[in-house]
Amino acid sequence: MVRWIQSHRADAEVVPLADRHYNRQKIGSPQFAPPGRCLVLKTPEVDAFWITSWPFAGYVKHAWAGAWVCSAFRNESKHLSSELIREAVAVTLAYYGSAPEQGMVTFVDTRKTKPKRHPGYCYLKAGFQYAGQTKGGLVALQMLPRDMPAAQRAAGEWKPYKPARKSEEVLW
């Protein structure tokens, strides 16, 4: 069973957790997700959260344009991060319907995380692969569609993704 429940970009319960994430832009801001298409998940205890953003490829400057992006994940729960990551990918797949060709990527800033031999180790354990680095030096990790778990809905109330306008309906 999936441990995630669907949330939203300005969930006041998630703000304190988001404020403790290393890439937080403005501490205390009521919104913590990047602009545009996104899926926000939280655990029922609000001790972990996840954001999948899906920026339009034309606005992306990194090499993985078109991919879903895990723009934030913080786990302060007892659950294994690698398990929560796989579940979040499964929920993202259920939410959007099918994965883009580039799959999902995440970026790890090794200057702002604890020094480790394998940056993003929990993502690697979840099935992501090393995909290179950004021009800014962030480690890029990627999960291709063939490696994704089967789609699963989040627990609780479910609101499926609906494009805001026809131009959002993208064919791969």
Predicted regions and their residues:
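Non-catalytic substrate-recognition and accessory regions of acyl/acetyltransferase enzymes
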Residues: 1-86, 90-107, 112-116, 121-172
